[in-house]
Amino acid sequence: QSLPLITAAHARSAGVDKGLKGIATRILRIPLKNRADYLFTCSKEAGIAVYGTKAVRDGRVWTIPNAIDAERFHFQQNVRDEIRTELGIQDKFVIGHVGRFGFMKNHTYLVDIFAKVCKERDDAVLVMIGKGEQEETIREKIKGLGLEDKAYFLGNRYDVEKYYQAFDYFVFPSTFEGLPGSVAEAQAAGLHCLVSDRVTREVALTPLVSYRNIEEDSKLWAEEILQNAQEALRREDMREAVAQKGFDVRRQAVQMAEFYRTGQNPPGHTTE
């Protein structure tokens, strides 16, 4: 008996590359929905991008969340104090971002937002975790704005959960995404999240997420952050809320193992 063929879609941006790479991606995508026994995706938008609207509408595509270890990310005051002391930002208003320095993460716009916040709050700092080809460009932009003493580039971190504790606000202005795990992690840490409207609504696991258009003036993003800054300091335990939405990796692992064992009842839900 042949093994079932499973394919998974993780990016709503599939095929956006220009030239031959984009053409090849779109062509190679065609057989997926016809040859695979199971079509998995991390979000409805990613499913449509890779498998097409009809496959999603017909209920052939299963959404399986990019689950996280919610326990690992829950808020701990002692960890917050430790990291803020380590970085020398004990009394600062900390805007945080976790993501690769690539064009899709839109760090240029993130810096524009931060610059507007700094005009109103002298205690604001920006902490960015990640590496990528756009990092030097962003460093130069920050230097040009005279904000180099307020921006922290921490590179890739294996202990990223500690840094979510140190943030006061999480800002994520991506140009496109599948279902960003960092936004789920930020919510598990009890952070208010201001997210691009290009990011799927499926990642709003809690009331902590709000969306804004990335085409609008960055000043409007800054104003929302400033308006909610005081409320954002009151952190809540969101572990169970995240788990209830199917984003707890421990629960999902049990369901996934059972599916691989039996070939029946994939975790998640059909994407319609």
Listing of model-derived features with the role each one plays in the protein:
Residues 139-155:
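Nucleotide-activated donor-binding/catalytic signature segment of Leloir-type glycosyltransferases, i.e.
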